[in-house]
């Protein structure tokens, strides 16, 4: 029985406090792969923490990234949008906060991380964040997006991606414009990235979110969620093998 532990990690960016969550199996003492998890637009939440715990139980150290600041914990969609949009519109700022989370994952001394085995994954807005972090040339062996947007202001940055990319997309997702898919494919192909895009038929936005219940827009789909997480774990097993 794994003993998954959650600890707060508080740090500053430009004088502002951020509080991420470090999630790991306390029974494992040897260095293990480290993952930065970018949550959906609701930020650090109980739901995001549950996902981080599930992933960490597979033998990873997960840093659930606070991208808004310790004082910002959205309680509804309007608050989430107000916190998210400045980052969506300023990818340099977004990447600064993602890199800070990656730095914290590697520098913390609570759970031993193998710094040669790093990856990022995220959900919705967080999927965009994981891909953008990869586009900066961060030392990631994999970047995984669950029902995230695929656009980037600088498609040429795809050439900076060092690892493999996995996009898990709902074919019926109305919140990811269809024109983003071929643009993303072109970006990846032009950059020579090892990439996979899986489009799940009948799946809407937020298909991994157990609380998503907005018919025709955002809907939890357990079957698709299970397949998507299995795909991520398959990729992580591949890139982290010795």
Where are these regions (language model features)?
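N-terminal cap/leader regions of alpha/beta-hydrolase-fold enzymes
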Residues: 1-242
